[in-house]
């Protein structure tokens, strides 16, 4: 199975952050907040059942898409397209056969970083766009120029672009310091294989982690 190019992963993540209405919904990999999906996701996880979070989900408009941190990455890799009429926004949950053929399995944030290659706690300025950035229970996508895309209930409560504190704060962005970074095994980095990030790629155009980030 051909893997998604890292450039494509970055562009899709940035597109979601900039051009779609999103909401942090635990266990959701891009579903539009239709009445049926609101019922589904206010019953699927104790985090979503909490009164305040359930109220947010119920108040979301039908053109809002739900994600959590690792499910943002999985949703993109599973073909999310922004469809407002498909249950998972166009993403397709992988079959056992698809996973055997190389598709991304349904792993949590910690499970994903455990499968990444070249995982390191240093070398932040040498990251290439499309790498995963991780802290316990939470994961995001490095997009270049010292920025990441992450879905978190913190700050804007949605898919958002933030500064990677390990590289440095950036004006106009909230800052998160991560613990490790590495290359996602279901992503093809051949388009970013030579040398560190130059910044030129930034801003073009059911989770098992805990939501305390």
Protein language model features and the residues they cover:
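Short, solvent-exposed coil/turn elements at secondary-structure transition points
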Residues: 30, 146, 154, 184-187
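Loop/turn positions that initiate beta-strands
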Residues: 129-131
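Catalytic Cys-His active-site segments of thiol-dependent hydrolases/isopeptidases
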Residues: 135, 141-170
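N-terminal capping segments
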Residues: 1-87, 136-138, 149-151, 195, ...
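Short alpha-helix capping/helix-loop boundary micro-motifs
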Residues: 113-123
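Activation targets extended, charge/polar-rich intrinsically disordered C-terminal tails
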Residues: 74, 78-115
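Low-complexity, Gly/Ser/Thr/Pro-rich intrinsically disordered linker/tail segments
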Residues: 169-213
